[in-house]
């Protein structure tokens, strides 16, 4: 029997590249998308599903017998533009899948998503969202999401569902009919019987249940007319009541614990997000569950089809999970020791009785593998590596470090050095993250690993303006506070030189999204420092970024976030193209709904007009993630050639 039946053909084709080190083979190995994008386990524990990457941008949903490991495909998405986002078991015979993508709407690019149910044989595909009609008075952009998997009612789900009103074409009664906004429905996936649970509200943003089918929390998005303000109001219900009451105190509810009749809430504690348990019995009693004096608590961990909360997470030098459940805590520790090459354990889901656990085991440098653990037999079974082309490769270790900024503040970062080298006098890459209110976590990064495999030292700074470190670190964000953020990124390059890691004549900067913005702006701020610049899907003009939001409901939020005044000019790489002296290579998808391709079009034109060496590679039909093996392989090949000609390797 093949060891990994989920992708036998891919294994035969791709493992031949694992032992070689030419640019083309490195680009193919690291540019290939995750072989297994996601997995789930059925309530009985007898079946597994996997969303597997196919050729190019395609994805395939496969069903696997947990005992025999026999797998067969049931549906495929083309990625042009629809891609499978996720699939889960609603019962042992019924699945729910989300698919989505981006499409041109007039002069804008807008995202869309749809929910469907289907049998485990791939047949009887049915839409779960509101059916689209010619009389719709708005764009049917998102179907909604599954709110509760109703483990006590197999084959039914609770869905928060988006509704668009229709024009009354009969000429009788009101000119407009139907619901508008976000509501909650119970749906029987076999009969497709829909039972309304919460009437749609135009300003509703989301709901939370107790995992038992009871809607306990409603989040309202405040708006002025149709323009969102970015503020929210939270309401709750007491157990057994239908009356909405104002939620006591501030914070962001993450989950409802039915067992304790409480909500788990993120709220500020000394300028950092902490986790609280807030009673929903009318008392408003609030108890601190967890806080960290350096970083934010960022989420809760759920397990099982009832989505029971079993712990919480935060990231200091790596992502950490703290479990409430002592059995799960002990199990995670034991399993981490049982798989020493993958000490980090993330539980994905469990069978209804909890006897079988689906999990992902990984390390700082390796994306890892999916495993199935049977608590009854104590048997641990490897199901599938996340990235087949890398299973025979020596990957680079990721080291958490810190370095001083120009003002003496210590900046956390990650350093990835080429495996097997001396770590001295290397060509080096500064790789700022996107966001900007995101952060690097020191886990597997295919772009950083590719660069290390090509012989480059790579530093990934969590500059001021990054998320996860509290309000003071976030400050004005990486756009309004660009001088500080870019200064911290510059200090990362100078740190590598000061430690003898980097050859000062062979420094480059590479970034994606905000990271691409930071790469270009850094090259304008420090024209003598970098010898090459790579910007992937970059923001290049802050005023253009604001104007692109004009047709969307979050326009005021975007404009407030980016800011205004002279600094938006000085902080726009497009306006400073003449100051950039290093050659620039840009990549952008023309269906990018996050950062319009116009940013790169204008940037390359401005650079060429200034007499600079610049090139833009446009990818047709791809969005911000460039989630296509062929495109990513081409991009890495071009990056490797470009860097080799600029700073060597």
Predicted regions and their residues:
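Conserved hydrophobic/aromatic "anchor" residues
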Residues: 41, 50, 89, 403, ...
């Amino acid at each position: 029997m093949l060891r990994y039946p989920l992708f036998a053909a891919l294994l035969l084709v791709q493992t031949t590249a694992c032992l070689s080190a030419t640019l083309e083979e490195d680009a193919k190995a690291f540019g290939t998308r995750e072989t297994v994008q996601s997995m789930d386990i059925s309530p009985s524990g007898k079946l597994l599903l996997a969303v597997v990457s196919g050729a190019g941008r395609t994805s395939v949903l496969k069903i696997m017998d947990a005992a025999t490991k026999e797998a067969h495909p049931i549906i495929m998405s083309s990625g042009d533009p629809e891609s499978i986002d996720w699939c889960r078991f609603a019962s042992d015979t019924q699945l729910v899948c989300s698919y989505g993508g981006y499409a041109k709407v007039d002069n804008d690019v807008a995202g869309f998503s749809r929910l469907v149910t289907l049998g485990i044989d791939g047949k009887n595909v049915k839409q779960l969202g509101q059916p689209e009609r010619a009389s719709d008075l708005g764009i049917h952009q998102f179907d909604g999401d599954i709110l509760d998997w109703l483990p006590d009612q197999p084959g039914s789900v609770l869905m928060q569902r988006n509704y668009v009103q229709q024009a009354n074409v009969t000429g009788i009664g009101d000119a407009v009919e139907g619901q508008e906004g976000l509501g909650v429905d119970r749906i029987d996936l076999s009969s497709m019987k829909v039972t309304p649970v919460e009437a749609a509200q135009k300003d509703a943003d989301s709901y939370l249940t107790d995992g038992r089918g009871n809607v306990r929390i409603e989040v309202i998005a405040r708006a002025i007319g149709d323009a969102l303000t970015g503020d929210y109001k939270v309401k709750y219900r007491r157990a057994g009541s239908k009356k909405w009451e104002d939620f006591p105190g501030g914070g962001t509810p993450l989950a409802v614990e039915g067992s304790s009749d409480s909500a788990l809430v993120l709220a500020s504690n000394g300028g950092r997000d902490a986790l609280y348990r807030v009673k929903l019995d009318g008392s408003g009693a609030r108890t601190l569950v967890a806080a960290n004096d350096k970083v934010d608590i960022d989420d809760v961990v759920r397990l099982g089809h009832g989505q029971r909360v079993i712990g919480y997470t935060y990231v200091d030098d790596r992502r950490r999970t703290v479990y409430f459940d002592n059995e799960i805590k002990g199990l995670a520790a034991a399993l981490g020791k049982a798989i020493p090459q993958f000490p980090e354990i993330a539980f994905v889901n469990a069978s209804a009785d909890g006897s079988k656990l689906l999990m992902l085991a990984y390390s700082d440098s390796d994306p890892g593998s999916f495993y199935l653990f049977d608590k009854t037999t104590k048997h641990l079974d490897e199901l599938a590596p996340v990235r087949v082309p890398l299973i025979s490769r020596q990957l680079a270790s990721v080291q958490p470090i810190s370095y001083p900024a120009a003002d003496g503040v210590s900046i956390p970062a990650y350093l990835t050095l080429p495996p097997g080298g001396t770590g001295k006098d290397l060509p080096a890459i500064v790789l700022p993250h996107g966001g900007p209110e995101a952060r690097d976590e020191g886990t597997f990064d295919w772009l950083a690993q590719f660069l290390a495999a090509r012989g480059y030292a790579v530093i990934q700074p969590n500059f001021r303006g990054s998320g996860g470190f509290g309000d003071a670190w976030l400050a004005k964000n990486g756009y309004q506070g660009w001088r500080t953020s870019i200064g911290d990124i510059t200090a990362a390059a100078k740190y590598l030189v000061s430690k003898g890691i980097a050859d000062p004549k062979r420094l480059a900067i590479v970034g994606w999204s905000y990271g691409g913005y930071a790469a270009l702006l850094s090259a304008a701020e420090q024209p003598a420092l970098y010898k090459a610049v790579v910007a992937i899907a970059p923001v290049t003009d802050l005023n253009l970024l604001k104007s692109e939001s004009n047709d969307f409901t979050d326009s005021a939020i975007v404009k407030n976030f980016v800011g205004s005044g002279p600094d938006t000019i000085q902080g726009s790489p497009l306006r400073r193209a003449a100051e950039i002296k290093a050659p620039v290579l840009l990549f952008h998808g023309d269906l990018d709904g996050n950062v319009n391709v116009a940013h790169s079009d204008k940037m390359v034109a401005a650079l060429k007009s200034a007499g600079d060496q610049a090139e833009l590679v446009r990818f047709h039909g791809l969005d911000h993630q460039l989630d296509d093996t062929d495109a990513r392989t081409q991009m890495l090949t071009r990056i490797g050639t470009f860097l080799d000609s600029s700073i060597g390797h």
